[in-house]
Amino acid sequence: MTTLTVVIPVYNAKKYLEECIGSVLDQTFRDYDIILVDDGSTDGSADLCDELASLHACVSVIHKANGGASSARNAGLKAAKGKFVHFIDSDDMLSGSKVYSELSSRAFNADPQIIFFRRERFTEGSREIDAVQPEYEFDGVFSGDVLRHMLEKNYEMTLTCPVNKIFKTDFLKQNELYFCEGIDHEEDEWLPRVIACAQNVWFDKGVFYTVRNRSDSLSATPNEEAAARKACSKIKIAVTGVDFMEQKRLSPDTMPLAAAYYWGYLTDACVDCSRFKSKENKRRVKAELKKNKQFFRSSRYLKSKNQRILGVLFRLLGVSPTVKLIGIRYGK
C-alpha cells in the first residue's frame, strides 16, 4: 500500500494539467500514486492524461463520461489504494517540492483522519500571491468534537474547501463519505459531513497548496439562470446538512452551531431569489423551498433570535412573503 493517493479530476484543463501534475511529480516524497480522472474532456486533456501515464509509472487514468467534479472525485476515491488521499484541482498546484515530505515527517505518523493545512492564491496573469489563508489557532493533533471546534472558530474556508486537506482513505470509504453529485457547491455539502464524522485530526500551519484564480472559471462568470441553480443547491445543502447532523445526534452544544451554519445557506438562497428579475428563476427557487418546508422546523435548534424568527415567518406567512422580507432585511 502506498502512503498517499493523489486524485486529480480533469475536465478541459489541458492548458494547466502539466504544471499541476508536475508539482506532484517534483515532490521529494516518493511514496504516492496519482489518479487522473478524465471527466469527458473535449480539449485534448484525455490524450494528455494518457501520455502522462505512459511516461510515469505512478500515474494512472480513469476515463469516464462527463458527470462533474463530484462524480470525478468519487471515481478517484473508489479507486484509491493509498492510506491517505489528496484531492487536487487540475488548474492548481502544490506549493513547493517538499509538501508531502514535511507532512510525512509530522502529520502522517500521527494517523489522523483529516490533515488540515493552509493554502495561498494567485490571480491568473500574475504569479504574485495575493491571498494567504490565516493560520489555525491550533497546531498538531486535535481530538474530540472537531465540527464544534471548526464552527466556533468560524473556519469558513475549512468547511468549504477540500484541496487544503488530506484524508484517511479508509475513514472516507467506511463512513461512505462520497461527494453529492448533481449539485453546485458540492464541496460545501461534503466537508461538514466529513468533519462531523472525524474524531482525530491534525492541524498544520504550513502553506502547502496554491490556488489559481481564473477569470474564465464557471464560478467567476455567473448569470441569473446559473445563480438560480446555485440558490437551489444552497437549499439542498441546508436541508441535507441538517438531516445528516440530526442523524449523527450531535451534542447539545454543537447542533445549534450546525443549524445556524445551514440556515446561513438558506438565507443566502432567499436573498439571491429576491434579486432575480426573471419570474421563472424566482419560481424555481421558491418551489425548492416549498418542497423542503420540513427544514423550517430546524429553527428550534437556533440560539439567534433573528434566525428563529425566520423559521416562524416561513411557517406562518409562507415562502413568498418571507423571501421578500429576507431580501429587504439582508439583501442590501
Regions found by a protein language model. Name each.
Residues 69, 90-205, 209-228:
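Donor-binding/catalytic cores of nucleotide-activated saccharide
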Residues 18-22, 46-47, 82, 95-108:
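Short alpha-helix within the catalytic core of nucleotide-sugar-dependent glycosyltransferases
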Residues 12-26:
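Short, well-formed alpha-helical segments that are part of the catalytic scaffolds
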Residues 207-215, 221-252, 268-296:
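Catalytic core of nucleotide-sugar-dependent glycosyltransferases
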Residues 64-80, 87-90:
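Glycine-rich, basic loop-to-helix element that forms the pyrophosphate-binding segment
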Residues 38-48, 65:
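A conserved acidic beta->alpha catalytic loop
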Residues 2-5, 23, 33, 189:
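Cell-envelope/extracellular polymer assembly enzymes that use nucleotide-activated donors
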Residues 273-332:
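Membrane-interface aromatic/basic loop that binds lipid-linked glycans or pyrophosphate carriers
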